[in-house]
Amino acid sequence: GWQGQRLEPDFAALRTAGYQAWWEHMPLPKAMRPVAGRARIHQRLDWGRLARIQLLDARQYRDPQACPKPGRGGSNTVRRHDCPALADPARSMLGAEQERWLAEGWALDRTWNLLAQTTLMARCSLTDTAQGGTYWNDGWDGYAANRQRLLAGVAERRVPGAVVLSGDVHANYVADLKVDFDDPRAPVVASEFCGTSISSQGAPQAR
């Protein structure tokens, strides 16, 4: 599958080779063939008049993860109070062009609008949110403003049957998605279903 952490984004030649290997060994349509070291992953599919399925690319166009720890780049957990960049509105997980593409793609005449993407979209803190919370900077919590823009667009357009399909976090989640996760009275604008891994271990479940 498409997992950005399997590639090394700092080295263009390795990334190009990774895209080519992915293309050669996965059952993909011709339209997704890599060109000039780039691979167009995001696309939309219509299932008659019942559903529109939009597939996102949350790896190629993103800003770097916020607040990297010394000696360790990439994915980390960071405290919200210690990392103002988590809420920086200029940062994007999708990139400006893909954000616009998605905003224009909701099908108001379909019963269902399914958004398939790679990781948990719901807010998920490892510590008490009343104390600010601790978040994984590689997922949507690391790009909170982009998530808010996406969900605000769903709310403003009253997108029917909005469902987000996710994975990556090695656990099953079912979540209500809101524009403002800090407001317990905020309306639900979409539902999320996150599938678990087949064999990889997830986070501890003890309470």
Predicted regions and their residues:
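Long, structured stretches of catalytic cores involved in phosphate-ester chemistry, encompassing
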Residues: 1-207
